[in-house]
């Protein structure tokens, strides 16, 4: 067999160690230093299964069973299971409580994985309206309109799905309003918290939520792939139905899900999560400061204003203008940031970009702001 494996040796990554990373998809998944030591204990394949009696969520050593109970309290739900990510959590709900051909009513900012999950479950969808440019906010009342439309057309509705915070604009949807609509109409309500649970406080019961899909690697300071599905006890029998052949195994979990480093890193980071969501107001303040400081340069923040989440999307005509005369063209901004020890902005992008300063210190935030100011002022 002629295979050269040298390229797989000594693989390194210096973005997090040597640079300030502004990538929104990564800011919430950074593991705290004190939690990293657990990796050395559990990096072997089935290391969490030393004392397993048949199911991941029932393991007592390490205390996965207690952790999941505590996580339910943290999210304001009844029962929690580990998954491989928010997309798998959504699919587990759709595949268990909906019938083939049912409709999922979901928001216009829904993540692509919501569509992939419902397609895989052989479901249909009805998309609700969102505000036009530049806010793109979810319109809660549109849910009632779409539900009425489907009911009048004799279409079966299986699920109401809302993206709590979308990844495109970082808008925080009005969950309580949509939850009240779902409850009044009598439909189960799934909240996609991939960009919220673990970053900001969540209380599923207060929000009238039946299911929460969370992402460990995106927003809960965990190694990937790792997610959580939290449910109300009302849906326990449907979502957590067990196999007729292997009676201890839950069907939607395919027996066991995220095992090894992903689930253990999430457990080790739990104390960190509990403390950091208490400081959410400070994260919002930092984000608003970035917007207020950079907009006078010629950046235009799109999405709801003022910011209520750490994701920032800027239109940047000033960068596009500089790119026209700079010999590096669209790569100049990436390269100038890299010189200053800043990464996470896509290479070659000048018309618009997304960023986040979640978890950065005030000193780091000021450095990012001043670095972008210096780039614009030097090259404009």
Curated annotation (Swiss-Prot):
Residue positions binding pyridoxal 5'-phosphate: 86-87, 192, 215-217
Key words, A-Z: Protein biosynthesis, Pyridoxal phosphate, Transferase
Residues bearing the modification N6-(pyridoxal phosphate)lysine: 218
Record InterPro entries: PyrdxlP-dep_Trfase, PyrdxlP-dep_Trfase_major, PyrdxlP-dep_Trfase_small, Sep_Cys-tRNA_synth_arc, SepSecS/SepCysS
Lineage: Archaea, Methanobacteriati, Methanobacteriota, Methanomada group, Methanococci
Residues in the signal sequence: none
Catalysed conversion reaction: O-phospho-L-seryl-tRNA(Cys) + hydrogen sulfide + H(+) = L-cysteinyl-tRNA(Cys) + phosphate
Statement: the UniProt record of this protein carries the keyword Cell wall biogenesis/degradation: no
Quaternary organization: Homodimer. Interacts with SepRS.
Family note: Belongs to the SepCysS family.
Annotated organism of origin: Methanococcus maripaludis (strain C7 / ATCC BAA-1331)
Name by which UniProt lists this protein: O-phospho-L-seryl-tRNA:Cys-tRNA synthase
Single Gene Ontology BP annotation: translation
Enzyme category, top tier: transferase
EC number in record: 2.5.1.73
The protein's role, per its UniProt record: Converts O-phospho-L-seryl-tRNA(Cys) (Sep-tRNA(Cys)) to L-cysteinyl-tRNA(Cys) (Cys-tRNA(Cys)).
